[in-house]
Amino acid sequence: MSDMKLSDLPNIGKTAVERLSKVGINNVEALLQAGSKEAWLRLLAEEHDTCLNTLYALEGAIQGIRWHDLADEKKQELKQFFNAMKKG
């Protein structure tokens, strides 16, 4: 994946690339290192209104799939994380 650009990943378009760049995630390796939860937390700290679908999209990008195709168990895990972070 090292030759890939962020925009080559599923779920990551021009706007997502710009948003991720603002929080220090400038390439695929940085996204993989951060993971979906950390990347989402960075976006949340910057934007304060980052939604659950963004978290799903980041995880899907890491897995190389459209976020709609994430396993139900993974979606549930991410939703619990999202709810815990939004309450905190």
What do these predicted regions represent?
Residues K22, A34-H48, L52-N53:
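Phosphate-backbone recognition surface of nucleic-acid-processing proteins
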Residues G60-G88:
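C-terminal structural segments of small proteins and small subunits
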Residues T15-V23:
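Catalytic DNA-binding helix-loop module of base-excision-repair DNA glycosylases/AP lyases
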Residues A16, N27-V28, A39, T54, ...:
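Amphipathic alpha-helical interface surfaces
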Residues M1-N11, E18, D49-I65:
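Extended, structured, electrostatic nucleic-acid-contact surfaces
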Residues D3, N26, A45-E46:
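Basic nucleic-acid-binding interfaces
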